[in-house]
């Protein structure tokens, strides 16, 4: 299996760098081939601008979706973007590894998504009609790929609990897991999250390293988060609202979009136990 490992941390000697090497060693031990995108080492350009679309007329107002669509269709995006798209096409699995900065992914990783998930590949796929609204949320170009997040956070685990001040970790990661990965069709596994990343000794690192190894061993077999498929009957089309008979009369929030309302962390604990 080919796994694209996208790493977004500026320091090779960091905790994240050490965790990455643990993941690499276990994935290779399982016989997987790793395709690496180390964004800081690559000097990845994070902003979308006119330079991304060399085929777009210089005197024409830049319309990013239209320019992205035209560039992708003619393989005329910049060389760095085309290379990443080639990696994605070759990969059977995707792992995004990053520290949680200001409740989201680092800007360099967001820029990788913005530039690489082109119109016609990451979005804008399939027919839009009264019967279906594109190939997305469970369908699309990533439909046969598995995906997972490896995340470090400085706060304590209770800070990210259902009643924690930072908000539930499932909610904070929802725009990435459901929006970035499930949107183009990937089967998204529960995340690996390490808390108190700035307060870790050798004994705890050894424990966390083994926990990460276990997740890498289960990459092919773990059950994905049971997100609801957009075109599977759970949503109205074209409004894309959850059907009124699903989720309960008072239910709301991100959990509605999972067929299993129990938190991801709870499901993962049950698997690990």
What are these regions (language model features)?
Residues 174, 179-190, 194, 219:
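Oxidoreductase and adenylate-handling cofactor-binding alpha/beta cores
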Residues 6, 20, 165-170, 202-210:
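C-terminal/domain-terminus segments
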Residues 93, 146, 190-191:
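Well-ordered beta-strand positions
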Residues 37-44, 186-203:
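Short connector loops at secondary-structure junctions
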Residues 124-182:
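Short, glycine-/small-residue-rich phosphate/pyrophosphate-handling segment
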Residues 1-125, 211-273:
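N-terminal beta1-alpha1-beta2 submodule of the flavodoxin-like/Rossmannoid cofactor-binding fold
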Residues 46-51, 160-162, 203-204:
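Short aromatic-enriched loop/helix-cap "lid" or pocket-rim segments at secondary-structure transitions
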Residues 89, 107, 142-143, 187:
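Structured loop/turn residues at beta-strand edges in well-structured enzyme cores
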């Amino acid at each position: 299996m080919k796994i694209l490992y996208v790493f977004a941390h500026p320091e090779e000697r960091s905790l994240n760098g050490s965790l990455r090497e643990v993941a690499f060693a276990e994935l290779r031990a399982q016989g997987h081939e790793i395709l690496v995108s180390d964004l800081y080492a690559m000097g990845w350009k994070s902003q979308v601008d006119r330079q991304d679309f060399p085929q777009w007329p210089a005197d024409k107002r830049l319309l990013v979706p239209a320019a992205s669509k035209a560039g992708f269709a003619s393989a005329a995006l910049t060389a760095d973007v085309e290379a990443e798209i080639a990696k994605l096409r070759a990969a059977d699995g995707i792992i995004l590894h990053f520290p949680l900065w200001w409740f989201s992914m680092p800007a360099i990783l967001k820029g990788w998504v913005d530039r690489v998930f082109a119109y016609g590949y990451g979005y804008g796929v399939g027919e839009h009609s009264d019967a279906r609204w594109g190939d997305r949320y469970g369908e699309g170009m990533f439909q046969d790929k598995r995906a997972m997040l490896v995340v470090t956070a400085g706060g304590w685990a209770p800070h990210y609990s259902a009643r924690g001040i930072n908000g539930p970790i499932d909610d904070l990661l929802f725009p990435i897991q459901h929006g970035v990965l499930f949107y183009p069709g990937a089967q998204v596994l529960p995340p690996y999250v390490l808390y108190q990343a700035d307060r870790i000794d050798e004994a705890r690192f050894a424990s966390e390293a083994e926990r990460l190894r276990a997740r890498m061993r289960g990459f092919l077999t773990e059950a994905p988060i049971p997100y609801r498929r957009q075109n599977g009957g759970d949503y109205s089309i074209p409004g894309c609202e959850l059907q009124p008979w699903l989720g309960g009369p008072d239910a709301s929030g991100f959990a509605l979009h999972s067929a299993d309302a129990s938190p991801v962390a709870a499901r993962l604990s049950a698997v690990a136990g």
